[in-house]
Amino acid sequence: MNVKRKILKNGSSFVSAVLAMGMFVQQVSAKTPADTLVMAWNLDTISTFDPAQINDRYGNEVLVNVCDNLVVSATDDAAKMVPSLAKSWDVSSDDQSTVITFHLRDGLKFNDGRPANANDLIWSMKRVVQLKMATAATFNEYGITEQNVDEAFQAPDDKTVVMKFDKPYPAELILSHFATSRTLALLDRETLMKHEKNGDMGNRYLASHSACVGPYQLESWRPGEGILLRASSNYWGEAPKLKKILIRHVAEPGTQRLLLQKHDIDVARNLMPEDLADLQATTDIKVERVLEPSVIIWGFNVTNPIFANEKVRLAMRYLIDYEGLGKTLLKDVGIPRASFIPLGNLGALDEKEGQPFKLDLPKAKQLLTEAGYPDGFEASIFAGASPYPFALPIAQSLQDNAKKVGVRFKIERFVGTQLFSKLSARTFDTIFFGWNNDSADPHTMASRLIYNPDNRFEAKNTGYASWCHGYLDETMNQKVQDALFQKDPKKRAQMYADLQREFMQKGPYAFIYQTYHTIAMTPDVKKWVWNSAPRIFYSAIEK
């Protein structure tokens, strides 16, 4: 069977569904529809479009283009917050609290034309807290819980939303964190409650639907096949430049490359570095790249007695050939980095100090002996080609180096959703995963990677990587809080620098590299709009 025929066959049911909706998607011709952006992307990790539950960057990218937020990062400056659902806001604060009052713009409507107001948004925000799923942590870390949510979120009228915080949290941090969060989506309460099952407030419905105010609506989602977004006819803002966004699930980079070369798609999202270099040198394909605030991590489960030992965790860092990886596998993919704060964020250690480790097998052996494992041990590494395509070859490199000091790693491969399930259930020894900073402020990394509000298994704090790894250090918790409330910018930056130096020696992770976000596209894409968050603005993309 030739490749084209295979591609068409594998996506036939999704294509049929798209055709049934009246959309013409060319699978084998040289042009995609002028009003449609067609992307190829590995969508293995997406399991829901519920703002209360979604916890993967792929689904999040789609959701923030379907559901508007109160505020959003500017297209040309990720650190600048600009109005969205809110046309303006006021901040009042003292030594005890912070209050932010948002004034909603006129003309907000759901996709079917019904008006949306502040009470709908308050319900949506409370829903996140009450469902106690992954993104509840976004509110919890600012002191908003099920016990005080009615007082914290209020709507004095249809156009006003008031958020009250019981500590003097920096308003700029809250705004930048919430700007990239899914938690401030204005949901369609009427639709969701019609589809409520056993008190889930529409959670199961949102596994395959959207119901919110935004420029696009989710027309179709077929796991393993693709996503179709259609522009909303009742959107309050400027109409999207393109009427439809079709995201095809294409797992293999080689297949994505073939589709892109033939112009059967407009954009490829998962190409390998060698493919990108070759395409740039030999074709008309354009490549866009930005260093993103995202890190790839090798995590250690501290509930496992072996990895509860700090010296074992430190020994693992000396098994990583940072220099070799940087020159080969990670070239044009990312920057080797052992710090939890990405380059570009406040207080981030520079490139040299942020990566002090090197491959040192004698040092690793010494630490293992001091930890009580002179003959090594057996453990597993969980990794997957999706959504981290370089995790498997890095894991294999680690496996080879570990053998030389007596550590016997078994590599187990999983697809994205399985990998996240293992992470959330703490059912792993070591695991590869990624973490993206939700703002330009380092607290949003420290608050999830270091801080742990409750390490009990029954707490199910799956929004915290620290909890997923069973890591709780009360001293480090306090240092995270102290840095958060430090008002002097220079002192605050120094506190984060010190926190990085300490955490890279004792934390439950070995940070591997900070990633580049790289996208390849045909010349048909005339305007690609994103910032360094990176936030991609589907509605502003032009062909």
Each PLM stretch: what is its role?
Residues 39, 222-225, 369-439, 489, ...:
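Ligand/substrate-recognition segments at binding pockets and active sites
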Residues 40-93, 126, 209-215:
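N-terminal lobe/hinge region of extracytoplasmic solute-binding protein
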Residues 74-76, 179-240, 244, 362, ...:
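Gly/Pro-rich hinge or "lid" segments in bacterial periplasmic/extracellular proteins
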Residues 103, 140-194:
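Surface-exposed binding/hinge segments that line
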Residues 204-207, 232-278, 408-410:
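Ligand-site clamp/hinge motif
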Residues 335-370, 387-393:
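Structural transition elements
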Residues 357, 405-419, 424, 447-522:
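Extracytoplasmic/peripheral linker and loop segments enriched in polar/acidic and small residues
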Residues 458, 519-543:
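Long beta-strand-rich cores associated with HINT superfamily self-processing modules
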